[in-house]
Amino acid sequence: MSSRPASQLFDAYFTSAPMRQVFSDQGRVQGMLDFEAGLARAEAAAGVIPRALVADIEAACRAELYDFDALAIAIGSAGNSAIPLVKALGKRIAASNAEAERYVHMGATSQDAMDSGLVLQLRAAIDLLERDLATLSRQLAAQAQRHAATPMAGRTWLQHATPVTLGMKIAGWLGAIDRHRPVSYTHLRAHETRHDI
């Protein structure tokens, strides 16, 4: 099972292959599984579950191990995505370590798994956005220098105005990106690190 683009014709305008992967069905499931692995690590560190069982739980927290067609059917019946995924995770772990299966999802709700999984997807998306904006900034800076003396019509209220250079126009775009990029990224990361899994 895979996520189809929202629009086969226009999706390429608004996203990228790495971003599609982050928000694919596999990315969604992996986010919830990463939550489950993180939960097991945190509970072991707090002495709630035996530390020796964490490796068995982590080993089963890989999205490629699961049957997405079966999950899709089960999700339709369950009404949310976490219930059938946690059942499948428990079943997979029980096959190799019945004791570890008892501690899967311990103390968590379905909403915890879904919300935390989404936050982990958003974390990956933020990293992609920052990477792409850094690349865009470098490319705009290079083009602003390259076209520092390239004349173009200035515009005001949809009319031609005093001539400007293309380099100056591009530098304006660059300035807007560079003013907002560090603030946005730092703000998002500051909120995220307080709740690191």
Give short role names for the model-derived ranges.
Residues 1-189:
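A helix-coil-helix interface module used to build multimeric assemblies
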Residues 187-197:
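Single conserved hydrophobic/aromatic residue that forms the stacking wall/gate
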